[in-house]
Amino acid sequence: MTNTKGKRRGTRYMFSRPFRKHGVVPLATYMRIYKKGDIVDIKGMGTVQKGMPHKCYHGKTGRVYNVTQHAVGIIVNKQVKGKILAKRINVRIEHIKHSKSRDSFLKRVKENDQKKKEAKEKGTWVQLKRQPAPPREAHFVRTNGKEPELLEPIPYEFMA
């Protein structure tokens, strides 16, 4: 049997609602404010068929470039064969949510500003870049009176 060519082909689980989350969409979904430049995650909601994004955009993150009464315009990167295209799509607000991907960065910016301010008052230099985790400190291992056992690999024997 051949594959059908429908818009919602293969979305049985993708657009289904979670367990005990069927029915009316919570009002908090409509109360969220979206502005130009916001970073949003696209996640299709099966209860609302209007303004639903195509399945290829499900789970993607984009930037808002246009806001209307019920929907927003989003710029999303989409891979088409060998190239990545910046696609502009219009999606209703039920199918998007603010992305948390930028929160950690903004938090770090605030912390760095605070560190800079304190360092300027003290007249000292402060490290602002994130550093990789250093190697663990040296420590002694307790043997409780037992001798350490030396482990050696078994020598290879060719059997033919």
Swiss-Prot record:
Subcellular location: Cytoplasm, Cytosol; Cytoplasm; Endoplasmic reticulum
Principal location class: cytoplasm
Disulphide linkage map: none
UniProt GO MF annotations: structural constituent of ribosome
InterPro entries: Ribosomal_eL21, Ribosomal_eL21_CS, Ribosomal_eL21_sf, Translation_prot_SH3-like_sf
Compositional bias (Basic and acidic residues): 112-123, 136-145
UniProt-listed GO biological process terms: cytoplasmic translation
Entry annotated with the keyword Endoplasmic reticulum: yes
Keyword DNA repair: no
Keywords attached to this entry: Cytoplasm, Endoplasmic reticulum, Ribonucleoprotein, Ribosomal protein
Matches recorded under SUPFAM superfamilies: Translation proteins SH3-like domain
Pfam family, one: Ribosomal_L21e
GO cellular component: cytoplasm; cytosol; cytosolic large ribosomal subunit; endoplasmic reticulum; postsynapse; ribosome; synapse
Region (Disordered): 112-145
Subunit structure: Component of the large ribosomal subunit.
Protein purpose: Component of the large ribosomal subunit. The ribosome is a large ribonucleoprotein complex responsible for the synthesis of proteins in the cell.
UniProt family annotation: Belongs to the eukaryotic ribosomal protein eL21 family.
Protein known as: Large ribosomal subunit protein eL21
Native species: Mus musculus (Mouse)
